Swiss-Prot record:
GO terms for biological process: acetyl-CoA biosynthetic process from acetate. One of its GO terms (molecular function) is acetate-CoA ligase activity. Pfam families: ACAS_N (PF16177), AMP-binding (PF00501), AMP-binding_C (PF13193). It catalyses: acetate + ATP + CoA = acetyl-CoA + AMP + diphosphate. PROSITE patterns: AMP_BINDING. This is Acetyl-coenzyme A synthetase. Its EC number is 6.2.1.1. Its cofactor is Mg(2+). Mg(2+) binds at V550, V555. It comes from Paraburkholderia phymatum (strain DSM 17167 / CIP 108236 / LMG 21445 / STM815). Acetylated. Deacetylation by the SIR2-homolog deacetylase activates the enzyme. InterPro entries: Ac_CoA_lig (IPR011904), ACAS_N (IPR032387), AMP-bd_C (IPR025110), AMP-bd_C_sf (IPR045851), AMP-binding_CS (IPR020845), AMP-dep_synth/lig_dom (IPR000873), ANL_N_sf (IPR042099). Disulfide bonds: none annotated. ATP binds at G397, E398, P399, D421, T422, W423, W424, Q425, T426, D512, R528, R539.
Amino acid sequence: MSAIESVLQERRVFQPSAEVAAQATVSGMDAYKALVAEAERDYEGFWGRLARETLSWNKPFTKVLDESNAPFYKWYDDGELNASYNSIDRHVEAGNGERVAIIFEADDGTITNVTYNDLLQRVSRFANALKQRGIKKGDRVVIYMPMSVEGIVAMQACARIGATHSVVFGGFSSKSLNERLVDVGAVALVTSDEQMRGGKALPLKNIADEALAMGGCEAVKSVIVYQRTGGKIGWDDKRDLWMHEITASESDHCPPEWVGAEHPLFILYTSGSTGKPKGVQHSTGGYLLWAAQTMKWTFDWKPTDVFWCTADIGWVTGHSYITYGPLTLGGTQVVFEGVPTYPNAGRFWDMIQKHKVTVFYTAPTAIRSLIKAAEADPKVHPKSYDLSTLRIIGTVGEPINPEAWVWYYENVGGSRCPIVDTWWQTETGGHMITPLPGATPLVPGSCTLPLPGIMAAVVDETGQDVPNGQGGILVVKRPWPSMIRTIWGDPERYKKSYFPEELGGTLYLAGDGSVRDKETGYFTIMGRIDDVLNVSGHRLGTMEIESALVANPLVAEAAVVGRPDDTTGEAVCAFVVLKRARPEGEEAAKIAADLRNWVGKEIGPIAKPKDIRFGDNLPKTRSGKIMRRLLRSLAKGEEITQDVSTLENPAILDQLGESR
């Protein structure tokens, strides 16, 4: 692999304000460097101290890190705790039961405040209801829910009894849900009749019924349904149960099930480059520690904060920075059911103003779409709202381009709020490389420096460090507590995917390209080095999309690549060969529309290709390998400069280039 060229030449620097630095948990670069030095000096002592200070343990651990079966690392292995106890009970016991845990705003603007006392009651009742249905420690429960208090309650209730939850994003199709139900071996499914998004009721229970009817998930004995809209749904009296009915008669008291620190808290599926989604397994102790610790460091969390992460609980960001991180610290947070553009594109800014949000965390995709809306209509421009309560703003899901960064800084942050541009992954459990708001000088487009204890580096294809200024492969050199433990049911795939022998078998392979600044050492993320696309912060495997396209009766062959997109960061571009003659004009447009809808049904709307181009064939080597790098160039509209001498059919490039 030749060195990755860095094209970002960003020299603007934004210093933390004295006001922010003065009250920060990590105040100034000297404090940051002291923590980094502590971790380097005594790695296990550093991580042991954080775990003792941050979490409540029923049985204290005596050993911090077990590397005897690397890369299957164990942290705090002989310790026992419960994630739900840490998230709820301990705050009630400390006299903070009447503190608001969740300010929930529904799609239609209805607001519900949930205190820690309320949350304890609701989680305990639902946990007891799960136990009544025979669900026990170690069982897997799939949660297919809208953004709701009930979704958070379901996750916390599983944690309370030691069941392992697997949340599936409510935008996924019945086929995607079925794959996950089968792979994880679920014994129960928690869902909703419908979900509300942008004023529209969208089905969930009926999609869940389709998924269950596909077979392979006969172990699912209970389907528990939250009544959100009262819409018409199918019903199976032998299997289906209303959430409100089964919890009504349950006790408010449910003792937490103490579990070992390595007990699987959850399994969350993420797209892989080989087609089948990967069930990323996370622990209880190490994961919970980092979700809470990064709240303290990255967001400089204070008890007086009103925190708002706009992610969905179906993604890891919603796990770490809605369900677990804020609650573990006893914080108050906003949870939002709807979308940023309904009833208008000022919804986020209105909510920040109304709820007096102090820390705001969203995706670059949302920012880019709201920039367009604000430029078109001054009424929904952030400067038309009072955002003065904000003190820290953040981004997650994908790198943010410098232009959007500066707009966000000036118009949402009022040129005074630090931006924490966070790099991390489903597999890392929490933030890895990010500025600290009271310490790190900010550079637009750079996630800056690793958090203390995170040994990130940029290496070449043999695992050797590359010099600053030269692009390479992003890796992490030492294990950390919140890291992925395995791929559910496939430990060999875990080793090959994340600790490849080509890099020596000991480096965690992030799968992203990166470059470090020659002077500051700051990291800039340069995108995926494999065939996983990042669309609006959602990781989508190209193989999954290709498989969905080829499953259509019209399609003989398909290849999917990404291309840059101003709104979604990356757009899906599909090159398709039909089983009949290559269509043109209106016929091509109609078939393309049908294929988009097909992919939406097979996988979910987020996977729909933005571009579909038809060809008589695909560019292939003589051995039959599709030349994806050439397709990437075509998708971007670039001139083909690569060597095409190995191509069996070079003329196809002209045809695919013209078929836009």
